[in-house]
């Protein structure tokens, strides 16, 4: 096992995150990542409905022992964001990567459940702002 923040935090063998790829990543890929010592992430919007999302999350929690991540678009273009957050509160993943907006609501709702909230940032100023959110 390579010892890094990533391997220690998620108890994985290799410090690798299978990137969330819109309409490419799928549960099978994340399950194989888990079986091979690293961790995968899938965009919530790869599941076309909130019902499919909840079913997919349930499968991943079972097959990956909860060791997977979800990429959430957190701006108004994600019409399912509230439902996705509700589902993630019921079935928490190991981590969430927020993109394209403020992660504040995601942090408030998921961090208390032990979910690591990672945030896409575009510059140091935004990184500091996100860091101040917790």
Predicted regions and their residues:
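Active-site entrance/lid segments in N-terminal catalytic domains of soluble metabolic enzymes
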Residues: 1-134
């Amino acid at each position: 096992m390579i010892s890094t923040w990533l391997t220690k935090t998620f108890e994985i063998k290799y410090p690798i995150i299978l990137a969330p790829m819109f309409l490419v990543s799928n549960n099978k890929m994340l399950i194989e990542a888990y079986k091979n010592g690293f961790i995968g992430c899938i965009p919530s919007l790869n599941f076309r409905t909130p019902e499919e999302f909840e079913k997919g999350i349930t499968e991943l929690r079972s097959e990956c022992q909860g060791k997977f991540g979800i990429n959430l678009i957190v701006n108004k273009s994600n019409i399912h964001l509230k439902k996705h957050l509700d589902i993630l509160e019921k079935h928490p993943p190991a981590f969430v990567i927020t993109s394209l907006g403020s992660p504040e609501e995601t942090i408030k709702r998921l961090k208390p459940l032990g979910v690591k909230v990672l945030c896409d940032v575009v510059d140091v100023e935004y990184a500091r702002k996100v860091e101040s959110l917790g």
